[in-house]
Structures are given as C-alpha cells and as structure tokens.
Amino acid sequence: MNFVVIGKDKGDGALRRQERPAHLEYVADRQGLILYAGPLIERGRMIGSIFIFDVPDRAALDAYLADDPYFTRPIFETIEIYESRCMVPESEPGFLVAEAERSRAAT
C-alpha cells in the first residue's frame, strides 16, 4: 500500500537541524519502504517534508513513524497521512489506458 505523509514544520527549524543526522541514518537503513521523500519548499524556504511510502499496511507505516526521529520529536506542527495509489509511472503497461476506459464506462 502507498501512503503519503506530509509534515509541516514547527518553529524556526532548529529542532529539525538537530535531529536531521539521526533521521537520515534511520531513513538510509529503510530505503526500500520509501518511494520518494524530500522537503516542502515555499518561496525558497523549507516548510516541511513529504514522504511517499510503499508498505504492507497502515500498521507498518505506524511502526516506521514510531521510530523515525522526525516523528518521535516535535519537529512538525501538523502531520497529514493519506492512503494513495501510484498511477504514474504505470505499475504495469497499459494501466492508464485501462483506467481511462473504466472511468468512461462508469459515467
């Protein structure tokens, strides 16, 4: 299952900078679970982070977040979690065309 996790920063980023080495080491040991991750940037300033996870279920995501220093410390003012599905790149050839046909048939 894919999950999108969006964390919006709290404060001036001092705690983020302090926890960043431990967070990066944690992520480096678990790269297979993250499809994409990086900073959210607004007007040239980092305002948070986005993570796209590929995990077996919500319990696996919760277990990951329970040990990641960015989520165990008060780095984020808000955290949003959404289940998602990868459409691009296609999970299998022809998926997008088949999905378009299903959508047309449903209307």
What is the role of each PLM region?
Residues M1-T107:
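Conserved, structured core segments of small domains
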